[in-house]
């Protein structure tokens, strides 16, 4: 076994609603608001697409997901040779890390961001430099100070998980202009569709200026397909050619591909879902207590508090399962009735 695995632990999911009910003696319904899932679910057209192809389950998938690749190519106006799919972004991050990193290499990212950047670097015996957050968000200037000619990968998460904060187009443009052109900069935009900020980066446009800027997106969040695992990277043709060597030949299932195509085609449904999310998100920031909430451009809100366990249990007692972190609690934005319960708790909670 690799010795570096001793530095890591397997992913530990939160307790199930049933287990939480038993642990805390809770009666009534519990709502899972801990994993940033789209509670509205996927487009109805997704279910139609799945039903239409159930007779094909005994076939292997088409390697490389060509139907979905063509759809993404048209949707984003990028060449198909620049797109690579994974079974969720977890696998995409794994493939990139495996293809790029060798023992002793170095990646640079942030503290308090998506853990798979760190996890996969350690698996490959690489070194990890984690720059502290600044005002709850990525400190691009601080990260830039750690990047040099020998850096192997830079990971940026925008908006960031778990804080929900973002950096703007001007900041990313400036950052990319100062990174050595041979150093890959991976921009993880898993929550892109929820963003309403007008100055959010046009990363696809920046890719026209910077060959080392690579973009990650997923169908797990706004498109509501977390259970089907479809994510992708848009990168240079050369990078995709090399990373494709790492990709398992049948990594995205036939059903997942059909579902993702149907979801992508129903942009009206996506707009409805993201609009509902932005309306409900704004309600949290209307509270006087919102000074304790980091500004979010996602479908979740990070609530800062020193009394993490108390807030987690207070929300649990009104039926809402959230995600505790060392410095606060991450809350997935739910339906209005669920948010009403959380808003009442948050409006009466003592944060210090």
Curated annotation (Swiss-Prot):
GO BP term, pick one: L-histidine biosynthetic process
Enzyme class (EC, first level): transferase
Catalytic activity: L-histidinol phosphate + 2-oxoglutarate = 3-(imidazol-4-yl)-2-oxopropyl phosphate + L-glutamate
Pathway(s) per entry: Amino-acid biosynthesis; L-histidine biosynthesis; L-histidine from 5-phospho-alpha-D-ribose 1-diphosphate: step 7/9
Any GO MF annotation of the entry: pyridoxal phosphate binding
Residues with the N6-(pyridoxal phosphate)lysine modification: 221
Gene3D superfamilies from the UniProt entry: Aspartate Aminotransferase, domain 1, Type I PLP-dependent aspartate aminotransferase-like (Major domain)
EC number assigned by the record: 2.6.1.9
Annotated keywords: Amino-acid biosynthesis, Aminotransferase, Histidine biosynthesis, Pyridoxal phosphate, Transferase
Pfam families in the record: Aminotran_1_2
Cofactor(s) needed for function: pyridoxal 5'-phosphate
Entries under PROSITE patterns matching the protein: AA_TRANSFER_CLASS_2 (PS00599)
Signal sequence, start to end: none
Assembly and binders: Homodimer.
PANTHER family attached to this UniProt entry: HISTIDINOL-PHOSPHATE AMINOTRANSFERASE, HISTIDINOL-PHOSPHATE AMINOTRANSFERASE 2
Entry-linked HAMAP family: HisC_aminotrans_2 (MF_01023)
UniProt family annotation: Belongs to the class-II pyridoxal-phosphate-dependent aminotransferase family. Histidinol-phosphate aminotransferase subfamily.
Protein name: Histidinol-phosphate aminotransferase
Native organism: Staphylococcus aureus (strain bovine RF122 / ET3-1)
């Amino acid at each position: 076994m690799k010795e570096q695995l001793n530095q890591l632990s397997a992913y530990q999911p939160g307790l199930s609603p049933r287990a939480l009910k038993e642990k805390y003696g809770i009666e009534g319904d519990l709502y899972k608001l801990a994993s940033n899932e789209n509670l509205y679910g996927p487009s109805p057209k997704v279910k139609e697409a799945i039903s239409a192809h159930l007779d094909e389950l005994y076939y292997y998938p088409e390697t490389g997901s060509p139907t979905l690749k063509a759809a993404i190519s048209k949707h984003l106006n990028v060449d198909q040779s620049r797109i690579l799919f994974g079974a969720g972004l977890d696998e995409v991050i794994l493939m990139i890390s495996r293809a790029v990193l060798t023992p002793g290499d170095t990646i640079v990212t942030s503290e308090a961001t998506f853990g798979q950047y760190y996890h996969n670097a350690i698996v490959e015996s690489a070194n990890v430099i984690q720059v502290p957050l600044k005002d709850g968000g990525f400190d691009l200037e601080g990260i830039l100070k750690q990047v040099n000619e020998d850096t192997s990968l830079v990971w940026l998460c925008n908006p960031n998980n778990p804080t929900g904060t973002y950096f703007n187009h001007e900041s990313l443009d400036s950052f990319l202009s100062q990174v050595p052109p041979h150093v890959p900069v991976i921009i993880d935009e898993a929550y892109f569709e929820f963003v309403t900020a007008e100055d959010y980066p046009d990363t696809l446009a920046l890719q026209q200026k910077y060959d080392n800027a690579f973009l990650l997106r997923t169908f797990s969040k706004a498109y509501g397909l977390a259970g089907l695992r479809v994510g992708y990277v848009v990168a240079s043709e050369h990078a995709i050619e090399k990373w494709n060597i790492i990709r398992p030949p049948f990594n995205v299932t036939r059903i997942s591909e059909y579902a993702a195509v149907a979801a992508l085609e129903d942009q009206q449904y996506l707009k409805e879902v993201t609009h509902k999310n932005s309306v409900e998100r704004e309600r949290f920031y209307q509270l006087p207590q919102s000074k304790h909430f980091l500004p979010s451009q996602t479908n979740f809100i990070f609530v800062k508090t020193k009394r993490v366990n108390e807030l987690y249990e207070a929300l649990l007692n009104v039926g809402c399962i959230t995600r505790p972190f060392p410095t606060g609690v991450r809350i997935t934005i739910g339906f209005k009735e669920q948010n009403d319960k959380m808003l009442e708790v948050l409006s009466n909670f003592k944060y210090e």
